Regions:
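N-terminal amphipathic/basic leader segments beginning at the initiator methionine
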Residues: 1-53
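Short glycine-rich or small-residue beta-strand-to-loop segments that form or flank ligand, phosphate
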Residues: 58-62, 95-106, 141-146
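Gly/Ser/Thr-rich loops at beta-strand to alpha-helix junctions
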Residues: 101-109, 149, 176-180
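A structural-propensity feature for long, helix-poor, extended segments
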Residues: 133-163
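A structural signal for small-residue-enriched, beta-sheet-centric alpha/beta enzyme cores
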Residues: 143-144, 173-307
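Proline-aspartate-enriched helix->loop->beta-strand connector
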Residues: 163, 168-169
Length: 307
């Protein structure tokens, strides 16, 4: 990495290290979004990119910041499509556990819990009233385990307990992420088959939620909702350099800015003032995409289910 500023996005890690071998890339340009697929194939690349071996898909739609409702539908449909591609071998009657990571009381960290409460849960029906269902329906349950500072219990301990009781065939985890670019807030969704570490968005890594730990496939979905203060400063320096044409000391100034901010403000992270509406929008997009993927429903049908 060229900077000490961390990113949770594999796409950004790759942008910083474009020449590393052991990485397969594919970019698909759609009408209003870009779909980037990255596959890290060996340990050397994983170490250099600071990301586990596996698949990473990024949906990027800059227009989302304007909140166009028709683009919400397109993003949900695209997310659903990519999720189904990761449902390899998942049976129609499988049990799926959706885990909403984060702190419901802190808006910028509440994405996971807000998605979890919008999931169309069916496990109780398949368990106790199966005749009430029209044919084969996946058994879906969701949980928002909270955070260590509120519950006093490691998030993964709670999830492990739920997993042992519900016995899911797959886990889908949702969490807020951190980006190196402020412009990615509210415009980007990443999904990966490598799992996630709660708190990774602010560098507060807890025990990981992944297939190695839980013994079942774990898909993680995240949205950048915070950026480091040093990131914004560096972006401003780049903009000034572009406007003035003075690029000579740009990298030196960026490193100095990062050092000054770190010494005086610590690892400060910031989020937009309209984060409430951003989280509301993104949680709806993600929950709808998950429900569409799990139940094979249309966008309109799913929106009625979770309204």
């Amino acid at each position: 990495m060229s900077s000490g500023i961390r990113t949770d996005l594999a796409l950004e890690s790759r942008e910083l290290n474009p020449d590393i071998e052991g990485v397969e890339e594919q970019t698909e340009e759609r009408e209003r979004m870009t779909v980037s697929r990255i596959k890290i194939t060996d340990r050397t690349a994983a170490k250099k990119l600071d990301k586990p071996i596996g698949k990473y898909v990024t949906l990027d739609a800059p227009e989302l910041c304007n909140r166009p409702l028709d683009l919400f539908e397109q993003m949900s449909a695209a997310l659903s499509e990519e999720l189904r591609d990761m449902f390899t071998g998942l049976k129609d009657d499988a049990t799926v556990l959706v885990v909403g990571l984060g702190n419901r009381s802190i808006t910028s960290d509440s994405l996971g819990p807000r998605v979890a409460e919008r999931i169309y849960v069916t496990r109780h029906v398949t368990e106790y009233m199966p005749d009430a269902l029209p044919g084969t329906v996946r058994s879906v349950c969701s949980v928002a385990p909270g955070v260590l500072g509120v519950t006093g219990i490691e998030t993964m301990e709670i999830v492990r307990g739920v997993k042992e009781y519900a016995k899911p065939d797959m886990i889908i985890a949702i969490d807020a992420l951190a980006s190196r670019r402020a412009a990615r807030i509210n415009t980007t969704i990443q999904l990966t088959d490598t799992g996630i570490s709660p708190g990774s968005g602010i560098g507060n890594n807890r025990k990981g939620l992944n297939s190695e730990v839980f013994g079942v496939p774990v898909i993680a979905i995240g949205v950048p909702l915070v950026v480091h203060a040093a990131t914004i400063t560096q972006e401003v320096i780049s903009l000034i350099a572009d406007k003035t044409g003075l690029h000579g000391d740009e990298e030196k100034l960026k490193r100095l800015a990062e050092q000054v901010i770190s010494e005086n403000l610590g690892q400060m992270v910031v989020t937009p003032k309209d984060i409430d509406s951003i989280v509301e929008d993104m949680s709806g997009i993600i929950a709808t995409g998950i429900n569409m993927a799990l139940f094979g429903k249309s966008y309109e049908d799913v929106r009625m289910l979770i309204a």
